[in-house]
């Protein structure tokens, strides 16, 4: 464990885009609802409510496939300007309790409340207060996880969804990690999970007892990362938007995709709007020096392309996508990401936007 015990909260809004639509239109509250593109335009689902999820509908799923699973699904186009505005209201609530806020998207964020004096420094009470404020002021529900380390806070926020809170105290970290199924750990996808199971690794305790060198040999960086997490170690800090040299968003597909059109729909309808909103928060002047795109294939090989570009433009990502997919070689795609490098205030540094440990 780390010497300094931190208090990290991960807040995740419940089916955010769909929840905003249900809040603003009572007719949507009792039906299976999704926000996404039209099936005739090969659209994809941005998010859906829990009624739709019961039928297997998921984010980034082609709308046509979602309608086959749930014929009564009502699909509405997204109102990104509204979602951005609500996200800003949520950020304002966070700021009452801490300035150490790391947004991951419009609907989720890490908060470090280690030094907060609110509620006598109780992270549990702060998380309860944040969820209460969001409900009372915005009529939306949020789930939260509290833990001394980031990845467990994120795991915990999912355990009592929707509209729930789960707290992992420092003395319970190792116990929770030991019993945690590996598929619950962020970054462990289907293919990796199969390989882990083939190696006899199913829960955190299995990894903790494994030989580190064998893990590194078999699984590379993933093995090293899992070994640390299995010992309750996650040294990543909560990084505020203004501390960043780059801003990025990415999405791991529940089912691999393969075509340019599928990739472009996800970029246009999901990733680009989120990147646009995050850039506005991180750098209101919107000064950038590069745009980049990242693709991870089904075989876990990753490739990136980044080019100098002075302004965020959707059409430029179209060009970058065409270029990066020339490296596809028939492989399916499991992850897609976009990023921009911010223009520093004093000096332009040519740093990679896609560091080896991934975007935070």
UniProtKB/Swiss-Prot annotation:
One of its GO terms (biological process) is DNA-templated DNA replication. PROSITE patterns: UMUC. Mg(2+) binds at residues 12, 107. Keywords: Cytoplasm, DNA damage, DNA repair, DNA replication, DNA-binding, DNA-directed DNA polymerase, Magnesium, Metal-binding, Mutator protein, Nucleotidyltransferase, Transferase. Its cofactor is Mg(2+). InterPro entries: DNA/RNA_pol_sf (IPR043502), DNA_pol_Y-fam_lit_finger_sf (IPR036775), DNA_pol_Y-fam_little_finger (IPR017961), DNA_polymerase-Y (IPR050116), DNApol_IV (IPR022880), PolY_HhH_motif (IPR024728), Rev_trsase/Diguanyl_cyclase (IPR043128), UmuC (IPR001126). Coiled coil: none annotated. It catalyses: DNA(n) + a 2'-deoxyribonucleoside 5'-triphosphate = DNA(n+1) + diphosphate. The keyword Cytoplasm applies. The active site is at residue 108. Residues 8-189 form the UmuC domain. One of its GO terms (cellular component) is cytosol. It comes from the Bacteria. It is found in: Cytoplasm. The record marks 17 as: Substrate discrimination. Its main location: cytoplasm. GO terms for molecular function: damaged DNA binding; DNA-directed DNA polymerase activity; magnesium ion binding. Poorly processive, error-prone DNA polymerase involved in untargeted mutagenesis. Copies undamaged DNA at stalled replication forks, which arise in vivo from mismatched or misaligned primer ends. These misaligned primers can be extended by PolIV. Exhibits no 3'-5' exonuclease (proofreading) activity. May be involved in translesional synthesis, in conjunction with the beta clamp from PolIII. This is DNA polymerase IV.
């Amino acid at each position: 464990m780390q010497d300094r015990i931190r208090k990290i909260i991960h807040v995740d809004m419940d089916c955010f885009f769909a929840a905003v639509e249900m809040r603003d239109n009572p007719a949507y509250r009792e039906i299976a609802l999704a926000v996404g593109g039209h099936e005739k335009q090969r659209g994809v689902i941005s998010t859906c409510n829990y009624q739709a999820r019961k039928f297997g509908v998921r984010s980034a799923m082609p709308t046509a496939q979602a309608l086959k699973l749930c014929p009564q699904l009502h699909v509405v186009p997204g109102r990104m300007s509204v979602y951005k505005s609500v996200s800003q209201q949520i950020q304002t609530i966070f700021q009452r309790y801490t300035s150490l806020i790391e947004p991951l998207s419009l609907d989720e964020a890490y908060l470090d409340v280690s030094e907060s004096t609110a509620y006598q420094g109780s992270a549990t009470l702060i998380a309860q207060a944040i969820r209460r404020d969001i409900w009372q002021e915005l009529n939306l529900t949020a789930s939260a996880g509290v833990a001394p380390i980031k990845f467990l806070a994120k795991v915990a926020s999912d355990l009592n969804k929707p509209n729930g809170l789960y707290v992992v105290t420092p003395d319970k970290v190792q116990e929770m990690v030991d019993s945690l199924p590996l598929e619950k750990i962020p970054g462990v996808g289907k293919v990796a999970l199969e390989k882990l199971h083939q190696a006899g690794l199913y829960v955190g305790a299995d990894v903790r007892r494994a030989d580190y060198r064998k893990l590194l040999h078999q699984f590379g960086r993933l093995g090293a990362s899992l070994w640390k997490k299995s010992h309750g170690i996650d040294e990543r800090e909560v990084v505020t938007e203004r501390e960043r040299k780059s801003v990025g968003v990415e999405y791991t597909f529940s089912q691999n995709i393969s075509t340019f059109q599928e990739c472009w729909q996800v970029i246009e309808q999901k990733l680009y709007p989120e990147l646009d909103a995050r850039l506005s928060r991180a750098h209101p002047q919107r000064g950038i020096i590069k745009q980049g795109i990242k693709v991870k294939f089904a075989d876990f090989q990753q490739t990136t392309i980044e080019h100098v570009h002075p302004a965020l433009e959707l059409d430029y990502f179209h060009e970058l996508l065409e270029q990066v997919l020339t490296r596809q070689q028939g492989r399916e795609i499991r992850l897609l990401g976009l990023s921009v490098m911010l223009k520093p205030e004093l000096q332009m540094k040519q740093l990679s936007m896609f560091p080896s440990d991934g975007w935070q």
